[in-house]
Amino acid sequence: MAMSPSLFYPVEQELCSLEKNLKAVAGTRHPILYAAAKHLFDAGGKRVRPALVFLVAKATSEKQDINTGQKRLAEITEIIHTASLVHDDIIDECTTRRGVKTVHNLFNTKIAVLAGDFLFAQSSWYLANIENLAVVKAISKVITDFAEGEIRQGLVHFDPSISIDAYIEKSFYKTASLIAASCRGAAMLNGSNHQINNDLYLYGKHMGLAFQIMDDVLDITGSTKSLGKPAGADLINGNLTSPLLFSLTQEASLNDLIDREFCNSTDIASTLFLIKRSGGITKAKDLAKEQVQAALSCLQFLPQSTPVSSLKELTHFIITRLS
């Protein structure tokens, strides 16, 4: 299901400007890095993260304005996210993302590593110029969290003993941390009080977890065409996600497939079938819905406004997409 344009209507103009600015970020004196970075941003994406920054910025402003610091924060958030995808694709040996070739597949691994590093460096430079130490600290911690999440994931490849709690914690580091910190950062740049800042951090955290669980479900249920990558790609790389973890108690034969690391040509298809048969997808959806409800509860103290309504609609969209 596509992201509805109406969800981001209150910040449509800001998102258009963001697209232009992201292309400018790729403007470097090194042609090959320029080509790699431009390829990434041209691939598009839902731009959920910067949209959330803009919506939170308007939701916490009496005049529903977005200041310069918040515009920079939205750009930084998307740059960091994009940089992390480049490195993730190298580690997971993905050949496509969003239906186009990954950077290391189009160029080579060396260029992809440098492109990811370049984007992280650019984000750090823009972040330093926001001139709000609390926001700088919060977003800087996210980059550390990315590394923490990747290490945790790497240590449990093809490990069926991983708990749901450990899965959630890893998902926080890899996905939710950035969304949580950027939502809080947008509110902080409006001078919001501690309670509002904390509520929006938790909103972003629960939204991020719901999105990650949703992506993990879609990795099982989606098609190569809709995903822009092969179904079961996470499993192929040894990343055992919630639908499979929930299925292990019902389908003992999954352990044999995991033990041989899905090496046979039919193993992934068999695994997807067993996950669907066992009810693992339903349980994963229920877990995502719990996160969605937790996110909604974090918005209850914000004054009603069009941006707040969009935040709620975006939250409900996750439930709709998982239905």
Swiss-Prot record:
<feature type="binding site">
    <location>
        <position position="174"/>
    </location>
    <ligand>
        <name>an all-trans-polyprenyl diphosphate</name>
    </ligand>
</feature>
<comment type="function">
    <text>Possible role in synthesis of the nonaprenyl side chain of plastoquinone or in synthesis of other prenyl chains such as undekaprenyl pyrophosphate.</text>
</comment>
<dbReference type="GO" id="GO:0008299">
    <property type="term" value="P:isoprenoid biosynthetic process"/>
</dbReference>
<keyword id="KW-0602">Photosynthesis</keyword>
<feature type="binding site">
    <location>
        <position position="92"/>
    </location>
    <ligand>
        <name>Mg(2+) 1</name>
    </ligand>
</feature>
<keyword id="KW-0934">Plastid</keyword>
<dbReference type="GO" id="GO:0009507">
    <property type="term" value="C:chloroplast"/>
</dbReference>
<feature type="binding site">
    <location>
        <position position="88"/>
    </location>
    <ligand>
        <name>Mg(2+) 1</name>
    </ligand>
</feature>
<feature type="binding site">
    <location>
        <position position="88"/>
    </location>
    <ligand>
        <name>Mg(2+) 2</name>
    </ligand>
</feature>
<dbReference type="InterPro" id="IPR000092">
    <property type="entry name" value="Polyprenyl_synt"/>
</dbReference>
<feature type="binding site">
    <location>
        <position position="81"/>
    </location>
    <ligand>
        <name>isopentenyl diphosphate</name>
    </ligand>
</feature>
<protein>
    <recommendedName>
        <fullName>Prenyl transferase</fullName>
        <ecNumber>2.5.1.-</ecNumber>
    </recommendedName>
</protein>
<feature type="binding site">
    <location>
        <position position="97"/>
    </location>
    <ligand>
        <name>an all-trans-polyprenyl diphosphate</name>
    </ligand>
</feature>
<dbReference type="GO" id="GO:0004659">
    <property type="term" value="F:prenyltransferase activity"/>
</dbReference>
<feature type="binding site">
    <location>
        <position position="46"/>
    </location>
    <ligand>
        <name>isopentenyl diphosphate</name>
    </ligand>
</feature>
<feature type="binding site">
    <location>
        <position position="92"/>
    </location>
    <ligand>
        <name>Mg(2+) 2</name>
    </ligand>
</feature>
<comment type="similarity">
    <text>Belongs to the FPP/GGPP synthase family.</text>
</comment>
<feature type="binding site">
    <location>
        <position position="49"/>
    </location>
    <ligand>
        <name>isopentenyl diphosphate</name>
    </ligand>
</feature>
<feature type="binding site">
    <location>
        <position position="212"/>
    </location>
    <ligand>
        <name>an all-trans-polyprenyl diphosphate</name>
    </ligand>
</feature>
<keyword id="KW-0808">Transferase</keyword>
<keyword id="KW-0414">Isoprene biosynthesis</keyword>
<dbReference type="InterPro" id="IPR033749">
    <property type="entry name" value="Polyprenyl_synt_CS"/>
</dbReference>
<dbReference type="GO" id="GO:0015979">
    <property type="term" value="P:photosynthesis"/>
</dbReference>
<feature type="binding site">
    <location>
        <position position="98"/>
    </location>
    <ligand>
        <name>isopentenyl diphosphate</name>
    </ligand>
</feature>
<feature type="binding site">
    <location>
        <position position="175"/>
    </location>
    <ligand>
        <name>an all-trans-polyprenyl diphosphate</name>
    </ligand>
</feature>
<keyword id="KW-0460">Magnesium</keyword>
<keyword id="KW-0150">Chloroplast</keyword>
<dbReference type="InterPro" id="IPR008949">
    <property type="entry name" value="Isoprenoid_synthase_dom_sf"/>
</dbReference>
<dbReference type="Pfam" id="PF00348">
    <property type="entry name" value="polyprenyl_synt"/>
</dbReference>
<keyword id="KW-0479">Metal-binding</keyword>
<dbReference type="GO" id="GO:0046872">
    <property type="term" value="F:metal ion binding"/>
</dbReference>
<dbReference type="GO" id="GO:1901663">
    <property type="term" value="P:quinone biosynthetic process"/>
</dbReference>
